């Protein structure tokens, strides 16, 4: 390998020898791409070695990597950019780009703790875990620190541990099967589904106290929001959300109301495409549905061709597009990143403008009205769906009958608008009044509902939760 660096120290060569490689790239241009990857990895390792030599932690890093031992000590670097990169405290937030990263050509550290090596950005523990352990790693949501790591990323200390063997991959929890009684009665018509599309939803801001780029969501919801008539809507919430908190709905604590019924276990299975995304401008569907197969993907406003990890809205045409929609599309920018990791879905705002999310599952978690729209500012992320919470609600709803289960269909649909919000606090009061928005259908939970509804007894007119 012809290095772009004038000299590669022996310790860097040794550490690069332990680098984990992804599957063979193959195809035209694979050699050039691999060469660029090798050069980037060399830069990342050389930069880290340079920093660790100053603190005497280099030997511990080499020991951890060569022995692959989690009982090694923490290998830390400062978590503030001014300490590690010598940047002046005069650097303001306005000087950082849309991901919170200052643009230096070699290696920089952002205000939110992200690291940039040769124009490629990421959190330092993610970069080095990807390099030495998991080449397919996408996000910090996929990692959790081992118990004896004193400087884990989640602890938000002045220093952060980059020892790749102090982190583990988050495993997707196995959802318990739902015991479904086979009912003999056949419904003559499908029960009405609660629809909040044309109602005026309440609004809430991103939960207070959550730091940007943090995967921590406080258990205590924000104070009760204000309804249209100016009164707090806590009473309305209590009436609407009478299913209790997710912690109270563990499937293991629920039992069928009639033990004499024929009970059949209905299991959850992961589909090939975990979600489907449709793009709308006002009330008009635009373009084809995007089917997500990768655990991490972005929906942005650029004109690059879409691929399995990227849904670009910039190329989509609409003859009915007006000036407001056109202007909004210009401000989508880097859009939103969606993660599906460990049975949880996260939305991270990458745009310079906020995104607005209506997630009944998230609203259930915080005790908000099911139709509440949450504003997510730039640089922040929010958990918008949790499979285990949904499984608990499904297990409880089965005991309440076909209609209660069917009502869970709306929990599997998430609406998200770019730049412009909607709801009681906005001029636009329905999602179809916003210039640019997307609708996510979570295929795994929807297909699980289908199987449960079929087991419970399908209506005479065939209609499923996917219809």
Swiss-Prot record:
<dbReference type="GO" id="GO:0071144">
    <property type="term" value="C:heteromeric SMAD protein complex"/>
</dbReference>
<dbReference type="Pfam" id="PF03165">
    <property type="entry name" value="MH1"/>
</dbReference>
<feature type="modified residue" description="Phosphoserine">
    <location>
        <position position="250"/>
    </location>
</feature>
<dbReference type="GO" id="GO:0045892">
    <property type="term" value="P:negative regulation of DNA-templated transcription"/>
</dbReference>
<keyword id="KW-0805">Transcription regulation</keyword>
<dbReference type="GO" id="GO:0005737">
    <property type="term" value="C:cytoplasm"/>
</dbReference>
<dbReference type="GO" id="GO:0009653">
    <property type="term" value="P:anatomical structure morphogenesis"/>
</dbReference>
<feature type="short sequence motif" description="PY-motif">
    <location>
        <begin position="221"/>
        <end position="225"/>
    </location>
</feature>
<dbReference type="GO" id="GO:0001701">
    <property type="term" value="P:in utero embryonic development"/>
</dbReference>
<dbReference type="GO" id="GO:0060039">
    <property type="term" value="P:pericardium development"/>
</dbReference>
<comment type="subunit">
    <text>Monomer; in the absence of TGF-beta. Heterodimer; in the presence of TGF-beta. Forms a heterodimer with co-SMAD, SMAD4, in the nucleus to form the transactivation complex SMAD2/SMAD4. Found in a complex with SMAD3 and TRIM33 upon addition of TGF-beta. Identified in a complex that contains at least ZNF451, SMAD2, SMAD3 and SMAD4. Interacts (via the MH2 domain) with ZFYVE9; may form trimers with the SMAD4 co-SMAD. Interacts with TAZ/WWRT1. Interacts with FOXH1. Interacts with SNW1. Interacts with CREB-binding protein (CBP) and EP300. Interacts with SNON. Interacts with ALK4/ACVR1B.</text>
</comment>
<dbReference type="GO" id="GO:0009791">
    <property type="term" value="P:post-embryonic development"/>
</dbReference>
<dbReference type="GO" id="GO:0038092">
    <property type="term" value="P:nodal signaling pathway"/>
</dbReference>
<dbReference type="GO" id="GO:0003677">
    <property type="term" value="F:DNA binding"/>
</dbReference>
<dbReference type="GO" id="GO:0070411">
    <property type="term" value="F:I-SMAD binding"/>
</dbReference>
<dbReference type="GO" id="GO:0030279">
    <property type="term" value="P:negative regulation of ossification"/>
</dbReference>
<dbReference type="GO" id="GO:0097718">
    <property type="term" value="F:disordered domain specific binding"/>
</dbReference>
<dbReference type="GO" id="GO:0032444">
    <property type="term" value="C:activin responsive factor complex"/>
</dbReference>
<dbReference type="InterPro" id="IPR013790">
    <property type="entry name" value="Dwarfin"/>
</dbReference>
<dbReference type="GO" id="GO:0048701">
    <property type="term" value="P:embryonic cranial skeleton morphogenesis"/>
</dbReference>
<comment type="function">
    <text>Receptor-regulated SMAD (R-SMAD) that is an intracellular signal transducer and transcriptional modulator activated by TGF-beta (transforming growth factor) and activin type 1 receptor kinases. Binds the TRE element in the promoter region of many genes that are regulated by TGF-beta and, on formation of the SMAD2/SMAD4 complex, activates transcription. Promotes TGFB1-mediated transcription of odontoblastic differentiation genes in dental papilla cells. Positively regulates PDPK1 kinase activity by stimulating its dissociation from the 14-3-3 protein YWHAQ which acts as a negative regulator.</text>
</comment>
<feature type="binding site">
    <location>
        <position position="149"/>
    </location>
    <ligand>
        <name>Zn(2+)</name>
    </ligand>
</feature>
<dbReference type="GO" id="GO:0017015">
    <property type="term" value="P:regulation of transforming growth factor beta receptor signaling pathway"/>
</dbReference>
<keyword id="KW-0862">Zinc</keyword>
<keyword id="KW-0963">Cytoplasm</keyword>
<dbReference type="GO" id="GO:0070412">
    <property type="term" value="F:R-SMAD binding"/>
</dbReference>
<dbReference type="InterPro" id="IPR003619">
    <property type="entry name" value="MAD_homology1_Dwarfin-type"/>
</dbReference>
<dbReference type="GO" id="GO:0071895">
    <property type="term" value="P:odontoblast differentiation"/>
</dbReference>
<feature type="modified residue" description="Phosphothreonine">
    <location>
        <position position="8"/>
    </location>
</feature>
<dbReference type="InterPro" id="IPR017855">
    <property type="entry name" value="SMAD-like_dom_sf"/>
</dbReference>
<feature type="compositionally biased region" description="Polar residues">
    <location>
        <begin position="207"/>
        <end position="217"/>
    </location>
</feature>
<dbReference type="GO" id="GO:0009749">
    <property type="term" value="P:response to glucose"/>
</dbReference>
<dbReference type="GO" id="GO:0007369">
    <property type="term" value="P:gastrulation"/>
</dbReference>
<dbReference type="GO" id="GO:0001228">
    <property type="term" value="F:DNA-binding transcription activator activity, RNA polymerase II-specific"/>
</dbReference>
<keyword id="KW-0539">Nucleus</keyword>
<dbReference type="GO" id="GO:0071559">
    <property type="term" value="P:response to transforming growth factor beta"/>
</dbReference>
<dbReference type="GO" id="GO:0070723">
    <property type="term" value="P:response to cholesterol"/>
</dbReference>
<dbReference type="GO" id="GO:0001707">
    <property type="term" value="P:mesoderm formation"/>
</dbReference>
<dbReference type="GO" id="GO:0003140">
    <property type="term" value="P:determination of left/right asymmetry in lateral mesoderm"/>
</dbReference>
<dbReference type="GO" id="GO:0031016">
    <property type="term" value="P:pancreas development"/>
</dbReference>
<dbReference type="GO" id="GO:0010718">
    <property type="term" value="P:positive regulation of epithelial to mesenchymal transition"/>
</dbReference>
<protein>
    <recommendedName>
        <fullName>Mothers against decapentaplegic homolog 2</fullName>
    </recommendedName>
</protein>
């Amino acid at each position: 390998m012809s290095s772009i660096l004038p000299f590669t120290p022996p310790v860097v060569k040794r550490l690069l020898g332990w680098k984990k490689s992804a599957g063979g790239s193959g195809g035209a241009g694979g050699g050039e791409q691999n060469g660029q990857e090798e050069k980037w990895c060399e830069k990342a390792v050389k930069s880290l070695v340079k920093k660790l030599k100053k603190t005497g932690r280099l030997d511990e890093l080499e020991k951890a990597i060569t022995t692959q031992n989690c009982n090694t000590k923490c290998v830390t670097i400062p978590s503030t950019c001014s300490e590690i990169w010598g940047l002046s405290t005069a650097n303001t937030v306005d000087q950082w780009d849309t991901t919170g990263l200052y643009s230096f050509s070699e290696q920089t550290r952002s205000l939110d703790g992200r690291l940039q090596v040769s124009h490629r950005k990421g959190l330092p523990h993610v970069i080095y875990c990807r390099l030495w352990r998991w080449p397919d790693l996408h996000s910090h949501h996929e990692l959790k620190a081992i118990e004896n790591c004193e400087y884990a990323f989640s602890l938000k200390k002045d220093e952060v541990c980059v020892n790749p063997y102090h982190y583990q991959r988050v495993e997707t929890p196995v959802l318990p099967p739902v015991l479904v009684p086979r009912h003999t009665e056949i419904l003559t018509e499908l029960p009405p589904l609660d629809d909040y599309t044309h109602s005026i939803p309440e609004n809430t801001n991103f939960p207070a106290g959550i730091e940007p780029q943090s995967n921590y969501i406080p258990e205590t919801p924000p104070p009760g929001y204000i309804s249209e008539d100016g009164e707090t809507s806590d009473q309305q919430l209590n009436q609407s959300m009478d299913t209790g908190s997710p912690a109270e709905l563990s499937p293991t604590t629920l039992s069928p109301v009639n033990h004499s019924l024929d009970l059949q276990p209905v299991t959850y299975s992961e589909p090939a495409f975990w979600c489907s995304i449709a793009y709308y401008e006002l009330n008009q569907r635009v373009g084809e549905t995007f089917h997500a197969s990768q655990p991490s993907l972005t929906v942005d406003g650029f004109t690059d061709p879409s691929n399995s990890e990227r849904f670009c809205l910039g190329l989509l045409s609409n003859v009915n597009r007006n000036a407001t929609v056109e202007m909004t599309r210009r401000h989508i920018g880097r859009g939103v990143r969606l993660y599906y990791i460990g049975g949880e879905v996260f939305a991270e705002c990458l745009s310079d403008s906020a995104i607005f999310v209506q997630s009944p599952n998230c609203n259930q978690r915080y005790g908000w009205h099911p139709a509440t729209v949450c504003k997510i500012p730039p640089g922040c992320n929010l958990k918008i769906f949790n499979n285990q919470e949904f499984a608990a609600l499904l297990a409880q709803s089965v005991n309440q009958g076909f209609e209660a289960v069917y009502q869970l269909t709306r929990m599997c649909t998430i609406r998200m608008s770019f730049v412009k919000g909607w709801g009681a606090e906005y001029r636009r009061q329905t999602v179809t009044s916003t210039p640019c928005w997307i609708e996510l259908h979570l295929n795994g939970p929807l297909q699980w509902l289908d199987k449960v509804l079929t087991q419970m007894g399908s209506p005479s007119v065939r209609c499923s939760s996917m219809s």
